C-alpha cells in the first residue's frame, strides 16, 4: 500500500512518523525528483517502483531557499529539493550547493502590483480618518517607497460619485468627521482620474465651483476663535476641529494635483467671501443646498446631525449659557447658605434642588451637626434645671462640639452609659454595705439601727434618682423590694428586740421564732443583693451524709465590715451588762433546744473550727430550707490579729454514750436520740481549715455545722462572755465531764458528748441542776465566747478549768 496511490507529502518533504501504516506512497526512488508521472495522471501507472512523483506539483521548490539551511543545525535531509546556497555534510557525504540560481522574478511582480496599486493607495489615503498634515507627509514618503501590498483588497470610494446612497452611508456610519478634510482631495482624484469615464462631469463641477477659495491657516484660526467666542465652547468645538486641516492638505501626492491647485488659486479673489462649505458639499456629491448665503446654517445643522450632537441656533445657545451660569450660581449659593448651620431655609433649598445637586460628605456632616445642635438647644430649653447632672453635662458637651462623626457620637453614647453604670454600681455597693452594717448594728445596739436606717435610705433615694433616667432592671427592682422589706422588718423588730433581755422563757421562745422568720427573709434578700453587688463572699462546702441534711455552706463577709464593727464593739464592751446577755443566751439556748439536733447517723464528723475570743456578741444566722439544706451565714467581726496567735487546737474525741437531759415538754422530740446512739464530734484547729480562701487579714473564720429540723426557720444567736457561770460549777461535775486526761475512756466519751451537745436540747434548760450549768458552759465554749482557751493538760487539776474559763 505505501507504494500505491498518491505520494506522502511528509515523506518527500519532511519526515513521516507513520511508517508502513501510512496510507500514502513512500518511494525512496522518487526522492528528490520533482517530475510528475504522466501515467499516474492518466491513472494507468501500475509500476511497483516509480521514479516519478505521484503528486501534483504546483511550486518550483528548487527555487525556494531551504529553511533549515539558515538554522544552527543546518539541513540534514539527503534528498532535499529546496535550494541550498552552501554545501553541507549529511551522514558524512558532502552535498554541493544547488546548481540552479535563484531568480529575481518574485520581486518584479510585487513592484508591478505596487505600481498598479498606487492609485488605490492614494484613494485609501483620502478615506483614512486621522489625516493630519504630519500623517499625510509620512504617507507620501511611504507611497514613494516600496510599500508591500495589503493583505485584503482596499475599500476604494470614488469621491466624484454623486450617489446619495454613498452619502447616506457616510452619515450613518459617523464618518462625517472626514468630510471637511476631503476639501482638496476631489481635485486630487480628478487630476488622477483624467482617463476616467466620469471626467466630463467632474470638469463641469470644477467649472461650477471655480469661485471658492482655499483659506490660509491664519484665516481658519481667526474664524475658529470667532466661532468659539460666539458659541461659548458649545457646539463650535466639533465644527472648528473639522475646519482645522484644510490648508496644508493640497498637493501631497503628485504633480498633476499641484496643477489643479494652481488653477484653483489663480481664480481666487481675496476680496470675496469664500464659499468653502458650498463647494465642498457640491464637489463631494453631498446634499446640495441653494447657492445663496443661506447655506451656512444648514451646513452647520448637517454637520451637527452627522456628529450626533444637537446643535441649535446661536440664539438658543446664548439662551443656554445663562442657564448654566444660573445653575452654577445657585450651586454656590446653596453651598454658601448650607455652610451656615443655623439657617433652615438653606436646608429646604438644598432639599428642593437636591434632584440636581449631589451632596458631598462635608455638606451632609454640616447638616447633621446643625440638626443635632438645634435639637440639643431645644432640649436644654424645655428641660431646664430639672435635668440630672449627667444629662446636662452631656448636653453641654454636645453643644460645644458642632461637627461630630458617627464614630464620635457612638463613642460618647457608650461613654455615658459606662459612666452611668459605674455610678449606679457604686451607689448599689454603698447601699449594700450600709445595709450589712445596719444588720450588724441591729444585733449589737438599738440606737445604731436608726442611724443605719437613715444612711441606707439616702443611697436608695440616689438610686431612685438615677433610675429616673435609666430603665430599671429586674435586679434593681429586687434590690428595692429587699430594702423595703428590710425597713419594715427593722421597724417591726425594734420593739420586741428591746424586750429580748427579759428572762421569761415562753415569751423569749415566741420572740426568737419571730426573729427567725424575719432573719430568714433577710437572708434571702441578702443573697439577691450579694448577686448584684461586688461584695466578695467566701464560701465553703462540707458534705454531710444525714437523713435530712445534705449541704452546709458558710459565707463570710468582707474585712471592711469587720473593721467597722470592731470600733462599735469596743464601745459596746464598756456598755454591755452581763445579766441581760445571760438572758439572751438562755432564750437562744431554749430555742435551739426545741430542735431535734441529734438526728444524725452514727459516724458523722463535725468540723468545728475554734473561734477567736471576743467580748462582744456575735450574730449567727441559720437558715434551713424545706429539703433541710442548711446554709450557715456567719456574719461576724472580731479582733483577729490580736488573739490569733493564742489559739490552740482543741481535741478530737469520740462519743460512745448518749445522755439526754431535757425538760418534760420537749420529750417527744428527743426520741430521735435513741435511734442514733453514736455521734462523732471532730474539732479541728484553725490552721487546718484551708477551705476558706481568705487573705491573711481575714483569716479569722468560723466553720460550724448545725443540723436542724426540716422546719423553715432561722435564728439569731447573740452571745456574750459569761465568766461567772464557770465559777458556779462544782469541781466534781467539771472533773467528771470536762477533763479527759484524768478520766478513763467512758468518762472522756461522756465529756465529748457534753461538748457535742453545745447545740443540743439540754442547753435550753434553766440553770437549776449542775449538769445544765455545764451544758450552758460548753455552749458558750463552742460558740467562741472564751476569754482564754481551755488547755486540757494532764497536769492540771479539776478546779483549774473554771478559773481558766
From Swiss-Prot:
It holds the Pfam family zf-CCCH_3. One of its GO terms (molecular function) is zinc ion binding. Residues 403-423 form a coiled coil. One of its GO terms (biological process) is poly(A)+ mRNA export from nucleus. Residues 140-194, 223-351, 364-433, 449-468, 481-506, 715-805 are annotated as: Disordered. Keywords: Coiled coil, Metal-binding, Repeat, Zinc, Zinc-finger. A zinc finger (C3H1-type) spans 2-29, 31-57. Residues 486-498, 730-749 have a biased composition (Low complexity). The keyword Metal-binding applies. Residues 364-390, 412-433, 455-468 have a biased composition (Basic and acidic residues). Residues 160-175, 789-805 have a biased composition (Acidic residues). Residues 391-402, 750-763 have a biased composition (Polar residues). May play a role in mRNA transport. This is Zinc finger CCCH domain-containing protein 11B. It comes from Homo sapiens. The gene is ZC3H11B.
Amino acid at each position: 500500500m505505501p507504494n500505491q496511490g498518491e505520494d506522502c507529502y511528509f515523506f518527500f518533504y519532511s519526515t513521516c512518523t507513520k511508517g508502513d501504516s501510512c496510507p500514502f506512497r513512500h518511494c525512496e526512488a522518487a526522492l528528490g525528483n520533482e517530475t510528475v508521472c504522466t501515467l499516474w495522471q492518466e491513472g494507468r501507472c501500475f509500476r511497483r517502483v516509480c521514479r516519478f512523483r505521484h503528486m501534483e506539483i504546483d511550486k518550483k521548490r528548487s527555487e525556494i531557499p531551504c529553511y533549515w539551511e539558515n538554522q544552527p543545525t543546518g539541513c540534514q535531509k539527503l534528498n532535499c529539493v529546496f535550494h541550498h546556497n552552501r554545501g553541507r555534510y549529511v551522514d558524512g557525504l558532502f552535498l554541493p550547493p544547488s546548481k540552479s540560481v535563484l531568480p529575481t522574478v518574485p520581486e518584479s511582480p510585487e513592484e508591478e502590483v505596487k505600481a498598479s496599486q498606487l492609485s488605490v493607495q492614494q484613494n485609501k489615503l483620502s478615506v483614512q480618518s486621522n489625516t493630519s498634515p504630519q500623517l499625510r507627509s509620512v504617507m507620501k514618503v511611504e507611497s514613494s517607497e516600496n510599500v508591500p501590498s495589503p493583505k485584503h483588497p482596499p475599500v476604494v470610494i470614488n469621491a466624484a460619485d454623486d450617489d446619495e446612497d454613498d452619502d447616506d452611508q457616510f452619515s450613518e456610519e459617523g464618518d462625517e468627521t472626514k468630510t471637511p478634510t476631503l476639501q482638496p482631495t476631489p481635485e486630487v482624484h480628478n487630476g488622477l482620474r483624467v482617463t476616467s469615464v466620469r471626467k466630463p462631469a467632474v470638469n463641469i463641477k470644477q467649472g461650477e465651483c471655480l469661485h471658492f477659495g482655499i483659506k490660509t491657516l491664519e484665516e481658519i484660526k481667526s474664524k475658529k476663535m470667532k466661532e468659539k467666542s460666539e458659541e461659548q465652547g458649545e457646539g463650535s468645538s466639533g465644527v472648528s476641529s473639522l475646519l482645522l486641516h484644510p490648508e496644508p492638505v493640497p498637493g501631497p501626492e503628485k504633480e498633476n494635483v499641484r496643477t489643479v491647485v494652481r488653477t484653483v488659486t489663480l481664480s481666487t479673489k481675496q476680496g470675496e467671501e469664500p464659499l468653502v462649505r458650498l463647494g465642498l458639499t457640491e464637489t463631494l456629491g453631498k446634499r446640495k443646498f441653494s447657492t445663496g448665503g443661506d447655506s451656512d446654517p444648514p451646513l452647520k445643522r448637517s454637520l451637527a446631525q452627522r456628529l450626533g450632537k444637537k446643535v441649535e441656533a446661536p440664539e438658543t445657545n446664548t439662551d443656554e449659557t445663562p442657564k448654566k451660569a444660573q445653575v452654577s450660581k445657585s450651586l454656590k449659593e446653596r453651598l454658601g447658605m448650607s455652610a451656615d448651620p443655623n439657617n433652615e431655609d438653606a436646608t429646604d433649598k438644598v432639599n428642593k434642588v437636591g434632584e440636581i445637586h449631589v451632596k458631598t460628605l462635608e455638606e451632609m456632616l454640616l447638616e447633621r451637626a446643625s440638626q443635632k445642635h438645634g435639637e440639643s438647644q431645644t432640649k436644654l430649653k424645655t428641660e431646664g434645671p430639672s435635668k440630672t447632672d449627667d444629662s446636662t453635662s452631656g448636653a453641654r458637651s454636645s453643644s460645644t462640639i458642632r461637627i461630630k462623626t458617627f464614630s464620635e457620637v457612638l463613642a460618647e453614647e457608650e461613654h455615658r452609659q459606662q459612666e452611668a453604670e459605674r455610678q449606679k454600681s457604686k451607689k448599689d455597693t454603698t447601699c449594700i454595705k450600709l445595709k450589712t452594717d445596719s444588720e450588724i448594728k441591729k444585733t449589737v445596739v438599738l440606737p445604731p439601727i436608726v442611724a443605719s436606717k437613715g444612711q441606707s435610705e439616702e443611697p436608695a433615694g440616689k438610686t431612685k434618682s438615677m433610675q429616673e433616667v435609666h430603665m430599671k432592671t429586674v435586679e434593681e427592682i429586687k434590690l428595692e423590694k429587699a430594702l423595703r422589706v428590710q425597713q419594715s422588718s427593722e421597724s417591726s423588730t425594734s420593739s420586741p428586740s428591746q424586750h429580748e433581755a427579759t428572762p421569761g422563757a415562753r415569751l423569749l421562745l415566741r420572740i426568737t421564732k419571730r426573729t427567725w422568720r424575719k432573719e430568714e427573709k433577710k437572708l434571702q434578700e441578702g443573697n439577691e443583693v450579694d448577686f448584684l453587688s461586688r461584695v466578695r463572699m467566701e464560701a465553703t462546702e462540707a458534705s454531710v451524709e444525714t437523713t435530712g441534711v445534705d449541704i452546709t455552706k458558710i459565707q463570710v463577709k468582707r474585712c471592711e465590715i469587720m473593721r467597722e464593727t470592731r470600733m462599735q464593739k469596743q464601745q459596746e464592751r464598756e456598755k454591755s451588762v452581763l445579766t441581760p446577755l445571760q438572758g439572751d443566751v438562755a432564750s437562744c439556748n431554749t430555742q435551739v433546744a426545741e430542735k431535734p439536733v441529734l438526728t444524725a447517723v452514727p459516724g458523722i464528723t463535725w468540723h468545728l473550727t475554734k473561734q477567736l475570743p471576743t467580748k462582744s456578741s456575735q450574730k449567727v444566722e441559720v437558715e434551713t430550707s424545706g429539703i433541710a439544706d442548711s446554709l450557715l451565714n456567719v456574719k461576724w467581726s472580731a479582733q483577729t490579729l490580736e488573739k490569733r496567735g493564742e489559739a490552740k487546737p482543741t481535741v478530737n474525741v469520740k462519743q460512745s454514750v448518749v445522755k439526754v437531759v431535757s425538760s418534760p415538754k420537749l420529750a417527744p422530740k428527743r426520741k430521735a436520740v435513741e435511734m442514733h446512739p453514736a455521734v462523732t464530734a471532730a474539732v479541728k484547729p484553725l490552721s487546718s481549715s484551708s477551705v476558706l480562701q481568705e487573705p491573711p487579714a481575714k483569716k479569722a473564720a468560723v466553720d460550724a455545722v448545725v443540723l436542724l429540723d426540716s422546719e423553715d426557720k432561722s435564728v439569731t444567736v447573740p452571745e456574750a462572755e459569761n465568766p461567772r457561770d464557770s465559777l458556779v460549777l462544782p469541781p466534781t461535775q467539771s472533773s467528771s465531764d470536762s477533763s479527759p486526761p484524768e478520766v478513763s475512756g467512758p468518762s472522756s466519751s461522756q465529756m465529748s458528748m457534753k461538748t457535742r451537745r453545745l447545740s443540743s436540747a439540754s442547753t435550753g434548760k434553766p440553770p437549776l441542776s449542775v449538769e445544765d450549768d455545764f451544758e450552758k458552759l460548753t455552749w458558750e465554749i463552742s460558740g467562741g465566747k472564751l476569754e482564754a482557751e481551755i488547755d486540757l493538760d494532764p497536769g492540771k487539776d479539776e478546779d483549774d478549768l473554771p478559773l481558766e474559763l
